[in-house]
Amino acid sequence: MTDTPPPEKPKLPWFKASPLAHGIMLAMFALVTAVLLAVANDSTSAPIAARGAEDLAASLEQVIPHDLHDNDLAAAMRPVSDAEEGTIKVYVATKAGAVTGLAYELSGPGYSGQIRVLLGIAPDGTLLGVRVLSHTETPGLGDKIEVAKDDWILGFAGKSLADPEPGHWKVKRDGGVFDQFSGATITPRAVVKTIYRGLMFFDRNKAALTAPLPPKS
């Protein structure tokens, strides 16, 4: 009886033949993945930036009326450092070179998260307008701080540190002059406090805020 030789083992593909080859394949895969991610990021970053610029411009126009300025608000930003609030990005409205308004954002803790508030202020410290940029408050209750849901936020236009007096910058339940919402006092209280902080920021930094913008080079 003739012995039959054992069948030859199938040869492994070259990329499985050794740990080195396997490592090379993994490195190539990682490189291709990184390149694809970079290309995808480049293709989406420009539209995202453009949308962000559009949203910023639209928000600024809501708190500083268009007829008060002849400059590009979004492009006229200067940082202002403050001992209480840190460094704040301030957008400066000008007309014929004179400062006519300022806009900046502050945030404060609401019922269920931070509430971002954009303030527009005249050079004399009077509020031109206020808008809530974002929040996570309770739908149907706290979301009345949105101008799309209620006109409550419009009531701050024309107010200042002198009107009402500082002791009355509170909701009515706390002895102030501003309405709270039925079933939601914490949210309007937080917005009132944030707006008051914004007015105090202006008061502390009025000289720097209302100084003329440097000429464009």
UniProtKB/Swiss-Prot annotation:
GO CC terms: plasma membrane; plasma membrane-derived chromatophore membrane
Enzyme class: translocase
Membrane topology category: Single-pass membrane protein
Molecular function terms, GO-annotated: electron transfer activity; FMN binding
Subunit structure: The complex is composed of six subunits: RnfA, RnfB, RnfC, RnfD, RnfE and RnfG.
Pfam families (alphabetical): FMN_bind (PF04205)
Its EC number(s): 7.-.-.-
The name this protein goes by in its record: Ion-translocating oxidoreductase complex subunit G
Location relative to the cell: Cellular chromatophore membrane
Induction remark: Expression is reduced under iron-limiting conditions.
InterPro entries: FMN-bd, Ion_transpt_RnfG/RsxG
Alphabetical UniProt keywords: Electron transport, Flavoprotein, FMN, Membrane, Nitrogen fixation, Phosphoprotein, Translocase, Transmembrane, Transmembrane helix, Transport
Modification type FMN phosphoryl threonine: residues: T185
Cofactor: FMN
Any GO BP: nitrogen fixation
Protein's job: Part of a membrane-bound complex that couples electron transfer with translocation of ions across the membrane. Required for nitrogen fixation. Involved in electron transfer to nitrogenase.
PANTHER family: ION-TRANSLOCATING OXIDOREDUCTASE COMPLEX SUBUNIT G
